UniProtKB/Swiss-Prot annotation:
Subunit-structure text: Homodimer.
Name of the coding gene: glyA
PANTHER family from the UniProt entry: SERINE HYDROXYMETHYLTRANSFERASE
Residues involved in (6S)-5,6,7,8-tetrahydrofolate binding: 121, 125-127, 355-357
Entry similarity comment: Belongs to the SHMT family.
Keyword Plastid appears in the UniProt entry: no
A GO term from the CC aspect: cytosol
Cofactor(s) demanded: pyridoxal 5'-phosphate
Protein name in the entry: Serine hydroxymethyltransferase
Source organism of the structure: Shewanella frigidimarina (strain NCIMB 400)
Length: 417
């Protein structure tokens, strides 16, 4: 017999301890992984609701199960809010992840073996943009493009590759690129060869929603995103479009269900609906503006301390610190900073001589610290501490000192006050 009083703490203390330990870790560590963020208690409330009990294969008004009248309301709210947020005429909120959203686009628009032009993972792309270890690289003929010596996307080279290889689809978007993408130029290239332009905006979706980063939606045939990262919602994916092409929309829907998924996660879709409503509020724009201000402030300190930033700066929420030529690997930097309660991730940089398991760089992002309330002053102070550790990564005196400073700063800015 189920009772509302049932709880994890009494029933499963081992699991409860792990959950509590993770809560403590998040409160006492500074999160700088560019793809991570803190979602709101309202989103978590939706995800913990009884919507988790409901199967709802199909789409609103066209389900394969009965009893879907209320989950139809939930999904419709999420769809309409996503369309409003991004200026789209189509939205599918069912993908369980960004990768599954991307997979659906490949399935809807391509045949196995088709040629695709995508950003090289080593230059800032994503696994699902054509990495040999991913489905995208295994099933399709991938032609990679990258960035030039200045860290910018070379659109002339992209156009040359497109004309030479005639891909059926060009992918825009990134996981470790700190510049502005010229979506209109990419659409021109795609149109020149009759290709689809598909944009994965996962990393900058929140910035785009707030109008602080150029939107790809008017230019791309189809756009995907995760709903966490800068959007600060639940972990999941979405597909949107403003192509006004009902045939395309039908293909995309079919590629999600039944093509790649069965029942949607209605509790997560409810969380997405909440997050989209939050992203439509005026304070969300203020937050995203601060995300970029904090990232720029951090870059300023890194450059002043003699560290190289790929692309020379940032126009979004992230930066890639290039450690080539230093007696420190990305893996070592990641571990040293972790010892001081600063969480980053090792990351390959262009022309990296080291393996992806070691790397010569670290990726840093400002969404989570901004969510805690950090402004430029705290971002600069924190970056100074990071540089102190990177300057002398094996010095435990420095690490211990920085850890104490981090704990004090975290206490001033709790995740959930």
């Amino acid at each position: 017999m189920l009772k509302k009083a049932m709880n994890i703490a009494d029933y499963d203390p081992e699991l409860f301890k792990a959950i509590e330990d993770e809560t403590c870790r998040q409160e006492e560590h500074i999160e700088l992984i560019a793809s991570e963020n803190y979602t709101s208690p309202r989103v978590m409330e939706a995800q913990g609701s009884q919507l988790t009990n409901k199967y709802a294969e199909g789409y609103p008004g066209k389900r394969y199960y009965g009893g879907c009248e209320y989950v139809d309301v939930v999904e419709t709210l999420a769809i309409e809010r996503a369309k409003e947020l991004f200026g789209a005429t189509y939205a599918n909120v069912q993908p369980h992840s960004g990768s599954q959203a991307n997979s659906a686009v490949f399935m809807a628009l391509l045949q196995p073996g088709d040629t695709v032009l995508g950003m090289n993972l080593a230059h800032g792309g994503h696994l699902t943009h054509g990495s040999p270890v991913n489905f995208s690289g295994k099933l399709y003929n991938i032609i990679p493009y990258g960035i030039d010596e200045a860290g910018k996307i070379d659109y002339d080279e992209m156009e040359r590759l497109a004309i030479e290889h005639k891909p059926k689809m060009i992918i825009g978007g990134f996981s470790a690129f700190s510049g502005i993408v010229d979506w209109a130029r990419m659409r021109e290239i795609a149109d020149k060869i009759g290709a689809y332009l598909f944009v994965d905006m996962a990393h900058v979706a929140g910035l785009i929603a707030a109008g602080v980063y150029p939107t790809p939606v008017p230019h791309a045939h189809v756009v995907t995103s995760t709903t966490h990262k800068t959007l600060a919602g639940p972990r999941g994916g979405i597909i949107i479009s403003a192509a006004d092409d009902e045939v395309l929309y039908k293909k995309l829907n079919s590629a999600v269900f039944p093509g790649g998924q069965g029942g949607p996660l209605m509790h997560v879709i409810a969380g997405k609906a909440v997050a989209f409503k939050e992203a439509l509020e005026p304070e969300f724009k203020v937050y995203q503006q601060q995300v970029v201000k904090n990232a720029k402030a951090m870059v300023e300190v890194f450059l002043a301390r003699g560290y190289k930033i790929v692309s020379g700066g940032t126009e979004n929420h992230l930066m890639l610190v290039d450690l080539i030529g230093r007696d420190l690997t990305g893996k070592e930097a990641d571990a040293a900073l972790g010892s001081a309660n600063i969480t980053v991730n090792k990351n390959s940089v262009p022309n990296d001589p080291r393996s992806p398991f070691v790397t010569s760089g670290i990726r840093i992002g400002s969404p989570a610290i901004t969510r805690r309330g950090f402004k430029e002053a705290e971002a600069k102070e924190l970056t100074g501490w990071i540089c102190d550790i990177l300057d002398d990564a094996t010095n435990t005196v420095v690490t211990d000192r920085v850890k104490g400073q981090v704990l004090a700063l975290c206490a001033r800015f709790p995740v959930y006050g």
